[in-house]
UniProtKB/Swiss-Prot annotation:
<dbReference type="GO" id="GO:0034511">
    <property type="term" value="F:U3 snoRNA binding"/>
</dbReference>
<dbReference type="Pfam" id="PF04950">
    <property type="entry name" value="RIBIOP_C"/>
</dbReference>
<dbReference type="GO" id="GO:0005525">
    <property type="term" value="F:GTP binding"/>
</dbReference>
<dbReference type="Pfam" id="PF08142">
    <property type="entry name" value="AARP2CN"/>
</dbReference>
<dbReference type="GO" id="GO:0005730">
    <property type="term" value="C:nucleolus"/>
</dbReference>
<keyword id="KW-0539">Nucleus</keyword>
<dbReference type="GO" id="GO:0000462">
    <property type="term" value="P:maturation of SSU-rRNA from tricistronic rRNA transcript (SSU-rRNA, 5.8S rRNA, LSU-rRNA)"/>
</dbReference>
<feature type="compositionally biased region" description="Acidic residues">
    <location>
        <begin position="376"/>
        <end position="409"/>
    </location>
</feature>
<feature type="compositionally biased region" description="Basic residues">
    <location>
        <begin position="9"/>
        <end position="25"/>
    </location>
</feature>
<feature type="domain" description="Bms1-type G">
    <location>
        <begin position="83"/>
        <end position="243"/>
    </location>
</feature>
<dbReference type="GO" id="GO:0003924">
    <property type="term" value="F:GTPase activity"/>
</dbReference>
<protein>
    <recommendedName>
        <fullName>Pre-rRNA-processing protein TSR1 homolog</fullName>
    </recommendedName>
</protein>
<comment type="similarity">
    <text>Belongs to the TRAFAC class translation factor GTPase superfamily. Bms1-like GTPase family. TSR1 subfamily.</text>
</comment>
<feature type="region of interest" description="Disordered">
    <location>
        <begin position="1"/>
        <end position="59"/>
    </location>
</feature>
<dbReference type="InterPro" id="IPR030387">
    <property type="entry name" value="G_Bms1/Tsr1_dom"/>
</dbReference>
<feature type="region of interest" description="Disordered">
    <location>
        <begin position="307"/>
        <end position="426"/>
    </location>
</feature>
<keyword id="KW-0690">Ribosome biogenesis</keyword>
Length: 785
């Protein structure tokens, strides 16, 4: 065996050397070459993420400081909040009654001191050194339930052991959830009385499944049968972490326990509302909202004797002025009074005057030119304007069906959606015309889905006159549209922010009264104190209206929130509403926006990116949309509930959502599609007919681009003859089955019919889900027949 190894020959090539200049360099080489200079990527990363430029110890110190600040804020809130914890008790299904449930809680501890007020049941619990106030609104009164939840710290649901909810319970849960939820505690009365452990766990899991289905809470359910269970429940109500609503975190509010009238002068008086001061520090310069009546000014806030003390005091404290308004308080001006003379008046030119003299008038036979000059034509002008408004603002109903006769106003209102499904289904005196009107609405919605925005060109008047307010766009996405062009007179009455985001940021930064030295801002030590709020210039009728109100909640307004503007809301149609909802000026909706309730007309538009948005003639079923109304300014986020109401006062939940912004410059464009038929096709040259019916209209709309459903693009070359045929040219050859389309656009605005809504709701005014579904099936059968 040879002991010598292999030796390379003379033809052996050496290994390639490592090329350090190719590929990635080491960190050390990069650092030495940069000499402290940072690249573009590093600069961009540092601008968006500051924690990358600091050390690990510095980041750890920042987290510790933020954690300590949160703990200090929590301790400050506990130290300064002296108001009792408000708990709203809502019973679902056939469970225990709220009053019986509260009576059992009162018997779990002998030291509990129970007092009552017109709106609450109050517990003073020396064992826990705390106070709890219970609200028991009637679940059949939706307004009462929502008002109680807006002011509550905890929402306590009493679930039935069967875990079965009625249609009304599901409807109520939907409204409550859309309105916003505070901290939730779920209680099952009778759960502890089940002896069989397996059966008890099955009941618990069934109820927890229903709770998770509604996405209410993950804390589980609690029994409320024994003394131990009730004590544990009271402890949880006191010590659980409170999650305030956005409404409560931004606005100072008060649950009114006593209402009095003082300094009565004529039809107005000074309203004295007594209750606990809750939320951020009260400011006497800010306005206060009275539900159903509007916004009013505050003169002063005084401390009063607490009617539900934790410990009885022998000495009665004297009344003390907590805050007093000054010359900086907000006024109650909600809109601007427009000046009709504030505008440029352009005098007509000589050519326009000569053209006006050539105007032809219809006069009786045998009338001379001198007599014809004295005939007034105001009525003709009004008729022409009315017909134009009917065509533009009522979805071109006259254009869509020329043979349809003019209907009375009652029928038009029924088409606008003011007849609820429950009225159709369950009234004994049912009217066949109303049924057919509902079927007609379904047909129109189906036609709009199949041929969106398509309109027949009128034959009795020129198209350039019928669509004189419309214009063509080269591209809906990229073409420009001036938001300040051709604004209605109502825009002179509203307010607009120069920069909405900056204004909102400044307003939110001042929440809580940073100017503590001002006499108009209450000190933090008075948070939760029982006080009297003096509201000036309130009509005397308000006291009579609130005589029977149990859950009256006052909210203070932020700056600018009393001013009228254009409010945009992102909504989604509720599944329980299956009837078509049109977007026209005859349909008014009831909106619950935060603590406000008002009626207004809305314009529906698409919720898409861009600077222009397409009008939705019908409320979309599956996707979200934006409703635009004239309403007081409300800073987002804020919850929105949308209802529709018939002439008998019955209401139906239509849509839910939140506030988008307050922007009058939002451009909502109504699209009208004119369709024609390709008469002769010669490769890319096509003769189109039935789109227009005279030569002048073809020349007028010649600059507008044409298209087909298959994606072909073209333009008008010239008119052929005098009966509306025109020669067109497209980018590719057309099929005989294609239709030629032309898009026209017009900006639309909502109608100014804002009014404060001041009626309490009841279950007879709501349409339950099962009834609506059955009615939709009946209407579908009627359409198929």
């Amino acid at each position: 065996m040879s002991t010598t190894g292999h030796r390379a020959g003379v033809f052996k090539k050496p290994s390639k050397p490592h090329k350090s200049w190719k590929g990635k360099r080491t960190k050390g080489e990069i650092t030495s070459e940069n000499r402290g200079r940072e690249g573009v990527k590093q600069l961009t990363r540092s601008a968006h993420s500051t924690h990358r430029t600091i050390s690990k110890d510095a980041r750890r110190n920042q987290l510790k400081m933020a954690r300590d600040q949160k703990m200090a804020d929590a301790m400050e809130r506990r130290r300064t909040s002296n108001a009792p914890c408000l708990v709203t008790v809502v019973s679902l299904g056939v469970g225990a009654r709220p009053t019986e449930f509260i009576k059992k809680l009162a018997t779990c501890d002998e030291t509990i001191i129970q007092t009552t007020s017109p709106s609450t049941i109050d517990f003073a619990i020396p064992r826990f050194k705390s106070r709890v106030s219970f609200l028991t609104p009637d679940k059949d009164n939706v307004d009462g339930v929502l008002d109680a939840i807006r002011a509550s710290d905890v929402l306590c649901f009493l679930w039935p052991m069967s875990a079965e909810l009625s249609e009304w319970d599901e409807q109520l849960l939907t409204i409550i959830k859309a309105n916003g939820l505070p901290t939730i505690v779920s209680v099952v009365p009778g759960l502890g009385s089940i002896a069989n452990h397996k059966k008890k766990e099955d009941v618990r899991k069934g109820i927890e499944f229903i709770i998770s289905k509604w996405s209410m809470s993950n804390a589980g359910v609690m029994p409320a049968d024994s003394v131990t269970d009730n004590l544990q429940l009271l402890r949880i109500l006191n010590e659980t972490k409170k999650k305030p609503l956005t409404l409560q975190a931004r606005h100072s509010y008060m649950l009114v326990e006593n209402l009095e009238c003082s300094d009565k002068t004529g039809e107005t008086c000074t309203l004295v509302a007594q209750g606990y001061l809750r939320g951020p520090e009260w400011n006497a310069n800010n306005l206060v909202h009275l539900p159903g009546f509007g916004d009013f000014q505050i003169s002063k806030i005084e401390s009063t004797v607490d009617p539900h003390p934790l410990k009885a005091h022998n000495k009665t404290p004297e009344a003390q002025i907590i805050a007093k308004s000054d010359d900086k308080r907000q006024n109650t001006e909600t809109e601007i009074t427009p000046d009709s003379m504030d505008g440029e008046q352009t005098w007509p030119t000589r050519e326009e005057l000569e053209e006006a003299d050539k105007e032809l008038r219809r006069v009786p036979k045998g009338t001379s030119s001198y007599q014809a000059a004295w005939i007034l034509d105001d009525e003709d002008d009004e008729d022409e304007e009315d017909s134009d408004e009917d065509m533009d603002d009522s979805d071109n109903e006259e254009v869509e069906d020329d043979s349809e006769e003019e209907e009375p106003m009652d029928d038009l209102k029924s088409e606008a959606g003011e007849t609820t499904a429950s009225e159709m289904m369950f009234d004994d005196g049912i009217d066949e015309d109303i049924n057919m009107a509902e079927v007609e609405k379904y047909r129109k919605e189906r036609e709009n889905a199949q041929w969106p925005d398509e309109v027949d060109t009128p034959m009795d008047m020129p198209a350039r006159i019928a669509f004189q307010k419309y214009r063509g766009l080269k591209s809906f996405r990229t073409s420009t549209w001036d938001p300040k062009e051709n604004l209605p007179l109502d825009y002179a009455r509203i307010f607009q922010f120069a920069n909405y985001r900056n204004t909102k940021k400044n307003v939110m930064s001042k929440i809580g009264g940073n100017d503590v030295d001002a006499d108009s801002v209450a000190d933090k030590k008075f948070n939760g104190a029982f006080a009297s709020v003096f509201i000036e210039n309130v009509p005397v009728a308000v006291l009579e209206a609130y005589k029977d109100a149990k859950n009256l909640v006052l909210f203070q307004l932020l700056p600018h929130e009393h001013k009228m503007s254009v409010l945009n809301m992102v909504l989604k149609k509720h599944p329980s509403c299956t009837i078509p909802i049109t977007s026209d000026q005859n349909q008014k909706f009831i909106f619950y926006v935060g603590f406000r309730q008002f009626e207004a007309n809305a314009v529906f538009s698409s919720n898409t990116p861009g600077d222009k948005f397409k009008l939705e003639r019908f409320m979309p079923t599956e996707k979200t949309f934006v409703a635009t109304v004239y309403a007081p300014i409300t800073f987002n986020p804020a919850t929105v509930l949308c209802f529709r109401q018939d002439d008998k006062g019955r209401q139906e939940l239509v849509a839910t959502g939140s506030i988008l912004d307050s922007n009058p410059d939002r451009i909502v464009l109504k699209r009208t599609v004119l369709a024609g038929h390709p008469y002769k096709i010669n490769r890319r040259a096509v003769v189109v007919r039935y789109m227009f019916f005279n030569r002048e209209d073809i020349e007028w709309f010649k600059p507008v681009e044409l298209y087909t459903p298959s994606g072909r693009r073209g333009h008008i070359k010239e008119a052929v003859g005098t009966h509306g045929n025109m020669k067109c040219r497209f980018d590719q050859q057309l099929n005989a089955q294609d239709s030629v389309m032309l898009n026209l656009y017009k900006r639309v605005f909502p109608v100014w019919n804002y009014s404060i809504f001041n009626r309490s709701l009841n279950p007879s005014r709501f349409v339950e889900r099962s009834r609506v579904e059955s009615i939709s099936l009946v209407n579908e059968d009627a359409m198929e027949e």
